[in-house]
């Protein structure tokens, strides 16, 4: 079975390397064009391109996928395409040239779109998973080939859930290819969407419900991290370890207590325990270290 692989970030490159190491015949790879990254704004190859080059697999980065993609298919004659976080919608006639299947990090039709892991955490989902589906002309709306579920812990972070879904995605991909072609069935249920992360999404407001605060911190931990303001400085907060309902709280964002577990902050309807705080230009440190360093104390208040 000859495979054309399309993908861009590290979530995709891990799946590509998994295919190669399991001796699947990846005949060509398509990735997004390289972009400037980091403080120096140097142009760097995409993670998928790096893996393709490592294994000497032909890799292409077309700016116009429909026309250039057809010539790639004509040249390498793949039987199917595997798509993982490529970053662009596939359109006819390229889309119709071979069957394309997408590995998506949610239980479709929930969380169609670019940020399914973050949005599932933000909404406090207790279950999520991987869906492999045949790509149609809409966004993540094609018939399903395979679904795999995974539970989400109360204090699960983006980082930990990402790793679990990466492992589950590889498992699902292996099962899918070993049983190809699949028996497809339509998506059922009301679709929900997972739009790209905006700067506004990262702003933490302690006047929101305490469970909402907990979930927002988890959704962007460890990257890029939610932001709040303390004593006029923009800080980031990481690793929620505790929540408790308290309807008597009237002041939001107040540091109620700091101990070796972390900082306990008031929010609407309850208290949120947070382990790490990051000050501008510094690495994250525990709340206790920040207290001992004179950076934060009980009674201080976070502003939204």
UniProtKB/Swiss-Prot annotation:
Enzyme type, top EC level: transferase
GO molecular function, one term: methionyl-tRNA formyltransferase activity
Underlying gene: fmt
Keywords: Protein biosynthesis, Transferase
Organism: Thermosipho africanus (strain TCF52B)
Entry's family note: Belongs to the Fmt family.
A Pfam family the protein falls into: Formyl_trans_C
PANTHER family assigned: METHIONYL-TRNA FORMYLTRANSFERASE, METHIONYL-TRNA FORMYLTRANSFERASE, MITOCHONDRIAL
Binding-site positions, (6S)-5,6,7,8-tetrahydrofolate: 106-109
Domain of life: Bacteria
Gene3D superfamilies attached to this UniProt entry: 3.40.50.12230
Function: Attaches a formyl group to the free amino group of methionyl-tRNA(fMet). The formyl group appears to play a dual role in the initiator identity of N-formylmethionyl-tRNA by promoting its recognition by IF2 and preventing the misappropriation of this tRNA by the elongation apparatus.
Catalytic activity: L-methionyl-tRNA(fMet) + (6R)-10-formyltetrahydrofolate = N-formyl-L-methionyl-tRNA(fMet) + (6S)-5,6,7,8-tetrahydrofolate + H(+)
InterPro entries: Fmt (IPR005794), Formyl_trans_C (IPR005793), Formyl_transf_N (IPR002376), Formyl_transf_N_sf (IPR036477), Formyl_transferase-like_C_sf (IPR011034), Met-tRNA-FMT_C (IPR044135), Met-tRNA-FMT_N (IPR041711)
GO cellular component terms, A-Z: cytosol
EC number(s) from the headed UniProt entry: 2.1.2.9
Protein's name in the database: Methionyl-tRNA formyltransferase
């Amino acid at each position: 079975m000859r495979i054309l692989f399309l993908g861009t970030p590290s979530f995709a490159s891990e799946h590509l390397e998994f295919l190669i190491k399991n001796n699947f015949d990846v005949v060509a790879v398509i990735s997004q064009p390289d972009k400037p990254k980091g403080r120096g704004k140097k142009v760097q190859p995409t993670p998928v391109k790096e893996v393709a080059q490592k294994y000497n697999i032909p890799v292409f980065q077309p700016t116009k996928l429909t026309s250039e993609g057809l010539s790639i298919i004509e040249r390498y004659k793949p039987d199917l395409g595997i798509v993982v976080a490529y970053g662009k919608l596939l359109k006819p006639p390229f889309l119709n040239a071979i069957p394309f299947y997408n590995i998506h990090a949610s239980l479709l039709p929930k969380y169609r779109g670019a940020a399914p892991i973050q949005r599932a955490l933000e909404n406090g989902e207790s279950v999520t998973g991987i869906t492999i589906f045949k790509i149609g002309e809409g966004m993540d709306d094609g018939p399903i080939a395979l679904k795999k579920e995974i539970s989400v812990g109360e204090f699960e972070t983006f980082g930990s859930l990402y790793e679990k879904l990466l492992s589950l995605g590889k498992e699902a991909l292996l099962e899918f290819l070993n049983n190809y072609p699949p028996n497809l069935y339509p998506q059922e249920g009301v679709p929900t969407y997972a739009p790209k992360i905006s700067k506004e999404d990262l702003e933490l407001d302690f006047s929101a419900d305490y469970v909402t605060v907990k979930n927002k911190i988890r959704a962007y931990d460890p990257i890029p991290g939610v932001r709040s303001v303390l004593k006029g400085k923009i800080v980031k907060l990481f690793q929620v370890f505790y929540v408790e309902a308290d309807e008597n709280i009237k002041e939001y964002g107040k540091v109620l207590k700091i101990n070796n577990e972390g900082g306990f902050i008031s929010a609407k309807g309850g208290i949120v325990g947070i382990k790490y705080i990051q000050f501008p230009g510094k690495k994250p440190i525990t709340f206790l270290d920040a207290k001992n360093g004179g950076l934060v104390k009980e009674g201080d208040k976070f502003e939204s």
